[in-house]
C-alpha cells in the first residue's frame, strides 16, 4: 500500500494530466458540448483505481452528453496516463460528475433569501398578534 504522500502526489499528477487531455487531446465532440473542468481526483491507497470528479457547466442534456463522452474516453485516458506517468500499474479511471458547486450555489441562494424570509415571517407574526388582542 502506498503512503498518503505518494497517493496525494499521484492524485495531483493525474488531475494535471487529465486536465491537459481535456483541453487538447480528447477529440470526442460530446466532451466539448459542456465546459468541463477536473475538480478532484481520488486515488485508492493501492493506486489501482482513480475517481476523477468533473464539473460540467451547461444544460442537463449537455451534461449527460459530456459524461457519456468522458465514459467512452476513459480507456484512452488510462492509456495516455500509462504513457506519461511512471507507475508500475496504471490506475483504472472512472469519471464522476461533481455537483458540489451546484449544491454550494443552492445553499448560497437560500442564505441570501433568508433575511427576506425572516422579515416576511416577522410581519406575519405581528399581524397575527394584533388579531388575537
Curated annotation (Swiss-Prot):
Give UniProt keywords alphabetically.
Answer: Cytoplasm, Ribosome biogenesis
Organism of provenance: Synechocystis sp. (strain ATCC 27184 / PCC 6803 / Kazusa)
Q: What does this protein do?
A: One of several proteins that assist in the late maturation steps of the functional core of the 30S ribosomal subunit. Associates with free 30S ribosomal subunits (but not with 30S subunits that are part of 70S ribosomes or polysomes). Required for efficient processing of 16S rRNA. May interact with the 5'-terminal helix region of 16S rRNA.
Fetch the InterPro entries from UniProt. KH_dom-like_a/b, RbfA, RbfA_dom_sf, Ribosome-bd_factorA_CS
Any keyword Plastid?
Answer: no
**For this chain's UniProt record, which GO biological process terms are given?**
maturation of SSU-rRNA; ribosome biogenesis
Where is it localised?
A: Cytoplasm
Query: What is this protein identified as?
Result: Ribosome-binding factor A
Q: What is annotated about its quaternary structure and interactions?
A: Monomer. Binds 30S ribosomal subunits, but not 50S ribosomal subunits or 70S ribosomes.
User: By its UniProt entry, which NCBIfam families does this protein fall under?
Assistant: rbfA (TIGR00082)
Q: Which gene encodes it?
A: rbfA
User: What PROSITE patterns would the database entry show?
Assistant: RBFA
What family name appears in the similarity comment?
Belongs to the RbfA family.
Top-level taxonomy: Bacteria, Bacillati, Cyanobacteriota, Cyanophyceae, Synechococcales
GO MF assignments: ribosomal small subunit binding
Pfam families named among the record's database cross-references: RBFA (PF02033)
Chief localisation class = cytoplasm
Taken from the UniProt entry, a GO cellular component term is: cytosol
